[in-house]
Amino acid sequence: MARVSGVDIPREKRVEVALTYVFGIGRTLSQKTLAETGVNPNTRVRDLSEEELVRIREYVDNNFKTEGDLRREVQADIRRKVEIGCYQGLRHRRGLPVHGQRTSTNARTRKGPRRAIAGKKKPGKK
């Protein structure tokens, strides 16, 4: 199994798609990597030579932040915003959407499941 930045990339997929399994590499960076290293994007990972894999691995490691480093950087950015008390930090702290989305309706993913306030009313005696 081919490894790039500590991630096993799937052997059956095209290289262009397989590289996107690495956190921090999307479609565009994948295409850029393959263009710079001179690898055909339509090649399957299983058909890559060892030399091509080494070129891809070195290019990714030298030019992009991926996996653990990138995750740590994102967490540090969020932590910094929370500490300085800016608006985005407050939204993170409260568990609400950060980028200006509406919250009157929707935003269920960020807010979590609904919590009933009083529960169902029982039918009263008449």
Curated annotation (Swiss-Prot):
Q: Which gene encodes it?
A: rpsM
Name the source organism: Streptomyces avermitilis (strain ATCC 31267 / DSM 46492 / JCM 5070 / NBRC 14893 / NCIMB 12804 / NRRL 8165 / MA-4680)
Record field: compositional bias (Basic residues): 108-126
Q: Which UniProt keywords apply?
A: Ribonucleoprotein, Ribosomal protein, RNA-binding, rRNA-binding, tRNA-binding
Q: Gene3D superfamilies under this entry? A: 1.10.8.50, 30s ribosomal protein s13, domain 2
Annotated HAMAP family: Ribosomal_uS13
Binding partners and assembly: Part of the 30S ribosomal subunit. Forms a loose heterodimer with protein S19. Forms two bridges to the 50S subunit in the 70S ribosome.
- Region feature Disordered, mapped onto this chain: 94-126
| Protein name as annotated | Small ribosomal subunit protein uS13
